[in-house]
């Protein structure tokens, strides 16, 4: 889910995550030659040769939550030692919520200041976050580059340099991946690595001067954008394959996730025909594979219920359950387990029917045996009123959402 500018500014500074105790970490220099050798396997989630999701070597199904600013809140001015995430982790653990997905880096270029200028403090804060997850028993899926334009902006390049492996953007990406993965790869709290958030919604959009990334110079963006700040599927392919290959230099087993949303309703036709023609079910399955290229080894979507009049495919009537069924079918074809990285029911849209809609989504997840999913969103106050979708100790009426997830997690564990 993309955040409005002011909401993101409020909730989204820098982010990284994981850890072991300080004396167990291995911090790489800028030279790969000094990185300690990679182990045969690491804790967390992996994928079997047949495409089955495993946790520490055993088949796994589970539903977690998005703890979007769980770490980034600590990087706001005066909040470096804010450890309220400990209470959040404990609250989730008591409800059998096994893992969280969260933003690992700053949304805007300005939000990278701590990492760029006071790296030791940045990692000290992240160490504390990871250690808390280890102690309380919460798994972590960090999303590295939540706002796609930010890394190129920091590198002083247009956004489409994500599609050029020799770019400064990729150089910065590789450096950051090395520092994070080598530092935290031994942590049992780390379950997987995710590239970013909904990059696929940015590709193949028509027009040279439309659908451009936002411009907020006070937060570090350029003063203007051009057609070079737009992405194509070819750029996405380079982004994802390069990210996954870099992860594999230092961690050969954990899952690597794109962080993609459900493809746009015309994604296949935008790629091949440059037209907003709705995709068929077959085209939807095909574009999922294209947008989650090897060595990314998970199919990722973010999905919220469509209006009954919209549907999902041009050639059949499909409700949310039908969408999930098609996505699971695609995952079996590709031998990549499905990660429904965001899902939820918004009170601002469904009102008194929110609980019914929530259960419809949850039933689709359970009935289709989706191996991994994460509800949007936990303990993110801006979405209390903006979307009516936040679940936290402060809004008791939505506690039922975690209670229902807990029941499904218990049934999944007992199968």
Q: Each PLM stretch: what is its role?
A:
Residues 16-19:
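C-terminal motif of bacterial Sec signal peptides marking the signal peptidase cleavage site
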Residues 61-65, 100-102, 140-142, 191-195, ...:
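Hydrophobic faces of well-ordered beta-strands that scaffold small-molecule active sites
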Residues 26-101, 113-116, 124, 131-135, ...:
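N-terminal carbohydrate-binding accessory modules
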Residues 21-23:
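Bacterial signal peptide processing site
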């Amino acid at each position: 889910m993309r955040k409005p500018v002011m909401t993101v500014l409020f909730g989204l500074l820098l982010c990284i995550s994981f850890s072991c105790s300080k004396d167990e970490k291995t911090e790489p220099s800028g030279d790969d030659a000094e990185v300690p050798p990679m182990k045969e396997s690491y804790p967390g989630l992996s994928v079997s040769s047949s495409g089955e999701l495993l946790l520490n070597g055993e088949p796994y199904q589970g539903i977690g939550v998005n703890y979007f600013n769980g770490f980034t809140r600590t990087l706001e001015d005066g909040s470096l030692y804010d450890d309220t995430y400990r209470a959040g982790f404990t609250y989730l653990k008591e409800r059998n919520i096994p893992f969280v997905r969260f933003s690992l880096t700053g949304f805007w270029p300005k939000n990278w200041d701590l990492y760029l200028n006071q790296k030791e403090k940045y990692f000290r804060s992240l160490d504390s976050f990871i250690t808390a997850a280890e102690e309380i028993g919460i798994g972590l899926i960090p999303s590295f580059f939540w706002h796609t334009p930010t890394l190129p902006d920091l590198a002083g390049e247009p956004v489409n340099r994500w599609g050029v492996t020799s770019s400064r953007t990729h150089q910065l990406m590789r450096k950051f991946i090395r520092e994070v993965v080598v530092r935290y790869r031994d942590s049992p709290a780390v379950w997987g690595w995710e590239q970013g958030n909904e990059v696929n919604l940015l590709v193949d959009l028509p027009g040279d001067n439309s659908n451009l990334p936002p411009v907020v110079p006070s937060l570090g963006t350029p003063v203007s954008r051009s057609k070079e700040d737009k992405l194509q599927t070819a750029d996405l392919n380079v982004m994802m394959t390069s990210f996954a290959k870099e992860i594999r230099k230092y961690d050969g087993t954990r899952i690597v996730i794109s962080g993609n949303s459900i493809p746009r309703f015309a994604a296949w036709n935008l790629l091949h025909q440059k037209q907003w023609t709705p995709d068929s079910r077959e085209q939807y399955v095909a574009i999922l594979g294209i947008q989650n290229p090897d060595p990314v080894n998970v199919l990722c979507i973010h999905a919220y219920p469509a209006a009954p009049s919209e549907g999902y495919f041009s050639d059949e009537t499909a409700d949310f359950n039908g969408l999930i069924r098609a996505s699971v079918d695609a995952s079996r074809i590709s031998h990549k387990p499905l990660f429904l990285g965001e899902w939820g029911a918004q009170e601002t849209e469904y009102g008194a029917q929110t609980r019914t809609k929530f259960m419809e989504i949850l039933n689709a997840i359970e009935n289709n045996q989706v191996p991994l999913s994460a509800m949007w969103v936990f303990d993110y106050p801006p979405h209390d009123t903006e979307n009516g979708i936040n679940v936290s100790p402060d809004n008791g009426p939505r506690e039922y959402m975690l209670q229902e997830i807990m029941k499904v997690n218990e049934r999944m564990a007992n199968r």
